[in-house]
Amino acid sequence: MSVVGIDLGFLNCYIAVARSGGIETIANEYSDRCTPACISLGSRTRAIGNAAKSQIVTNVRNTIHGFKKLHGRSFDDPIVQTERIRLPYELQKMPNGSAGVKVRYLEEERPFAIEQVTGMLLAKLKETSENALKKPVADCVISIPSFFTDAERRSVMAAAQVAGLNCLRLMNETTAVALAYGIYKQDLPPLDEKPRNVVFIDMGHSAYQVLVCAFNKGKLKVLATTFDPYLGGRNFDEALVDYFCDEFKTKYKINVKENSRALLRLYQECEKLKKLMSANASDLPLNIECFMNDLDVSSKMNRAQFEQLCASLLARVEPPLKAVMEQANLQREDISSIEIVGGATRIPAVKEQITKFFLKDISTTLNADEAVARGCALQCAILSPAFKVREFSITDLVPYSITLRWKTSFEDGSGECEVFCKNHPAPFSKVITFHKKEPFELEAFYTNLHEVPYPDARIGSFTIQNVFPQSDGDSSKVKVKVRVNIHGIFSVASASVIEKQNLEGDHSDAPMETETSFKNENKDNMDKMQVDQEEGHQKCHAEHTPEEEIDHTGAKTKSAVSDKQDRLNQTLKKGKVKSIDLPIQSSLCRQLGQDLLNSYIENEGKMIMQDKLEKERNDAKNAVEEYVYDFRDRLGTVYEKFITPEDLSKLSAVLEDTENWLYEDGEDQPKQVYVDKLQELKKYGQPIQMKYMEHEERPKALNDLGKKIQLVMKVIEAYRNKDERYDHLDPTEMEKVEKCISDAMSWLNSKMNAQNKLSLTQDPVVKVSEIVAKSKELDNFCNPIIYKPKPKAEVPEDKPKANSEHNGPMDGQSGTETKSDSTKDSSQHTKSSGEMEVD
């Protein structure tokens, strides 16, 4: 089983894998560990990653990038409309109201949902992982910003399904960084001591996130998280772009923002300039050739000017830092370390703002680009049964408070209950008790919409079905379990009705459960419930999430253990209690329908197949082109001596015609046409290539055969001279060897003489394969005869053996015992003999 962590960034993506040696960030086909989050669609195929990034300027309208913020949002969303102004490609309203991308693919205009676009990118990352690991990849952990809402998280989960990935967890980026930091620390305080508090600051290309985390040995607990979803490296790029646009408008009388291609080039140059200014404080030039209207533009900028230009952006660094400390109830002196990650944290002014707030040096021990991917890979390894990882528990939190609303029995009345407050531990489950006589609907929404970077407070509605009054006409007791799962997504996990079944006999005197007794019991069990919750935080798996029970009034009631005891008491007093599961109908905000998701998965499969077929077609075409260029080059060099002038002229014409055909009629042909064309060319080229190869390899083959003949002749000569090494050989067989050698020499001389009379342009008389076969034939016939080993001299039998003839088995003895003794004597003799040899 593969263990993969994916950092799905706004600008770039990183992939980390867990191997026996640890966590490793893998490289793509360009030997680059960074894969741009970019997809370019063409008339026949798609380019994804590095190949797509190179087409941003050349294929402006059909190259998709910067789409991460469009997840889970409607087309009319203010954020989508803001992004629409920035993006050079066209956005379109999809049939379900969500934002989509309109591009030209396979010679027609096509809309793609954001889930499809991200699915394409994830499929590419999956392919890169499989190429590196040499095995299929399915399970993974994908990073998302901590401020993503339920709709955005579900959208990313759908994109993973489109790519054929099984996402074990959607992990908050800052939590992934904290895991990558903490799991390797050997000096963390024990569980019974005060935890070590660490601040993690992540400023990427599009967002700014801050997290405070408490570490103990084997434990990570997120205390608070804050963010600015609209502050990142691209905002600093935009400040530079706006500055230079104004300057060029005055200096060169050109409006850069009217030309999307020129604007993209300026963005690229400003990003480079920003990175250079992080390392240099002096004036740095900006030069772009043939920028617009065949104009070359130039300017300059230094770090001081840049910081002054971005003063309003730098002022936004401190508020999230202040807010996270307030939410965590910590002072500056409580913080042990400040860790920074993300590309934009390399800007000196950003570092200065952070240092100024905390009044201590910041730490850069983590890899600013790869820390998120590494944390995701570690989480995947923890969740995977295939890897044994050091025990390490992770407790994340709910970034926004969540409230449930339902209709009450009063006319036009409704009830509300805040089930999860802000910064509540997650994953977590709670049980809420309702008293209902009919099916009812629960509406989940974010309590404080002004805190959520999303225009719609609704999460979804959940209808609890099959609720009926009890047999005695009373309201049914319905227990509803709500959960924030391992992905940070809210759901109504289950619902059940408690049905009373009276025992035989009169139980009218049995005590009833009243509001008073309920409240008194609540006081007795509150402390115990809180302890159970804290213990439950140690596990990050959804199936191990802690639970808490709430009455429909919103007041906390009994813990699970206490409630079970009460049920037992009520059963003894009043009768049997039966729990029946109820069906739940969910209607989630911006949820993709299963049919639509299946169509996206099917379309992705078709596009992958189209890419594969196009690659094979291009490979076949390139093979023809490569053969033409390579053979033409060889005709002027190594093949020149092996072709007549007439044939050279004809073949050169064929090669030239093929080259012209490739760029004219053969520009766009099916794969089989190119395969046939290559075979046709090889009919001309292979005879020449064969002559060249025969000429190159023939001398070595002839030399090897000559050496073998000489070697056998030396043995024959030694045999004739009565050499004692060969005096055991059979004379008849040696005569056969002499005849074989004589025939081989005659064959060799005749073939060499005939070959020497031919020119290099003629077909050879004898092929290398024939010479090699003759050499093997000689070996097979002569070697068994001339290398026949001498027979060993007979060794005289030992005299004690004669005496042993009288040592047969006596009466009452078996032959087996005698044999055993004989074996023992033999072994002793052998040992003795061995000792003598040593001496």
Curated annotation (Swiss-Prot):
Predominant subcellular localization, coarse grouping: cytoplasm
Keyword Phosphoprotein: yes
Upregulating conditions: By heat shock and osmotic imbalance.
Disulphide bond pairs: none
Top-rank taxon: Eukaryota
Modified positions (Phosphothreonine) in chain numbering: T545, T761
Subcellular localization(s) per the UniProt record: Cytoplasm; Nucleus
Keywords: ATP-binding, Chaperone, Cytoplasm, Nucleotide-binding, Nucleus, Phosphoprotein, Stress response
GO molecular function: adenyl-nucleotide exchange factor activity; ATP binding; ATP-dependent protein folding chaperone
Cross-referenced InterPro entries: ATPase_NBD (IPR043129), Heat_shock_70_CS (IPR018181), HSP70_C_sf (IPR029048), HSP70_peptide-bd_sf (IPR029047), Hsp_70_fam (IPR013126), HSPA4L_NBD (IPR042708)
GO CC, one annotated term: nucleus
Basic and acidic residues: bias regions: 503-554, 791-804, 818-839
Region of interest called Disordered, as start-end residue ranges on this chain: 503-567, 786-839
GO BP term (any one): response to unfolded protein
Chain positions found as Phosphoserine: S74, S508, S579
Subunit structure and binding partners: Homodimer.
Family stated for the protein in its record: Belongs to the heat shock protein 70 family.
Annotated function: Possesses chaperone activity in vitro where it inhibits aggregation of citrate synthase.
Protein name (record): Heat shock 70 kDa protein 4L
Originating species: Homo sapiens (Human)
Lineage of producing organism: Eukaryota, Metazoa, Chordata, Craniata, Vertebrata
